[in-house]
């Protein structure tokens, strides 16, 4: 059996794996246990009452968190003409068409989000094998294929998170940094849950938001009591 590190022993002693914590208590506990030498992210896992094997029950989308994620986001935009100028004005680091595609083919991937106008998809389509595995392929379902690239850039910069359930019907994303005020983390979580409720598939039956857990980058998961979350009400 692997030997527990001091950090893991502290987490094991502090976190009751059988308990659902009030949201404020959960955040306080996460902050107390976040002792890494960097500012850890606060991540959320939301178990949804869906059958992930059925395509019509998969949940995918994006939402802007009211207090952002605390991350600095670099944006690449495939577009041309007036849209290119608008994207630059909105703060995009990289803007182009074939020239940008060539950079990416050479392995130059210094960006976190890729946005494209519809007319640019003929170029972006050639990059599927490069962007797809990294989760960077633009998609209209998450607002990254759009005629209004400037707005999409602003959303990305403002702290937009994209979400997509995994094969077990669980959404994994981030809601901020551990040094955020507790109220800001709670409001970000509420905003995400509201977005997930709006994205509920019509064919999903029963309890939709089954479980909500929070964790930090290096910490253990803490289950959250949904009765303290207005947005989680089914």
Curated annotation (Swiss-Prot):
Disulfide bonds: none
MF term (GO), any: rRNA binding
GO CC terms, sorted: cytosolic large ribosomal subunit
Gene3D superfamilies: 3.30.190.20, 3.40.50.790
GO process terms (BP): regulation of translation; translation
Subunit structure, as described in the record: Part of the 50S ribosomal subunit.
Family: Belongs to the universal ribosomal protein uL1 family.
Its job: Binds directly to 23S rRNA. The L1 stalk is quite mobile in the ribosome, and is involved in E site tRNA release.
Record protein name field: Large ribosomal subunit protein uL1
Organism: Cronobacter sakazakii (strain ATCC BAA-894)
């Amino acid at each position: 059996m692997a030997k527990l590190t001091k950090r893991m022993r502290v987490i094991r002693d502090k976190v009751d794996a059988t308990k659902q914590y009030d949201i404020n208590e959960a955040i306080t506990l996460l902050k107390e246990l976040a002792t890494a030498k960097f500012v850890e992210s606060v991540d959320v896992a939301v178990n949804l009452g869906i059958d992930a094997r059925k395509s019509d029950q998969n949940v995918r989308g994006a939402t802007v968190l009211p207090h952002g994620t605390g991350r600095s986001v670099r944006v690449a935009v495939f577009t041309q003409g007036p849209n290119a100028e608008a994207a630059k004005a909105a703060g995009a680091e990289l803007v182009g068409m074939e020239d940008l595609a060539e950079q990416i083919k050479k392995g130059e991937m210094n960006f976190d989000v890729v946005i494209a106008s519809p007319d640019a998809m003929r170029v972006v389509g050639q990059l599927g094998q490069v962007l797809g595995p990294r989760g960077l392929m633009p998609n209209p379902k998450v607002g990254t294929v759009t005629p209004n690239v400037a707005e999409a850039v602003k959303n990305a910069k403002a702290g937009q998170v994209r979400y997509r359930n995994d094969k077990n019907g669980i959404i994994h994303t981030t809601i901020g940094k551990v040094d955020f005020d507790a109220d800001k983390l709670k409001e970000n979580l509420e905003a995400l849950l509201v977005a997930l409720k709006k994205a509920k598939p019509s064919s999903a039956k029963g309890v939709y938001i089954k479980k909500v857990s929070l964790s930090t980058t290096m910490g253990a998961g803490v289950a959250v009591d949904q009765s303290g979350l207005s947005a989680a009400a089914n």
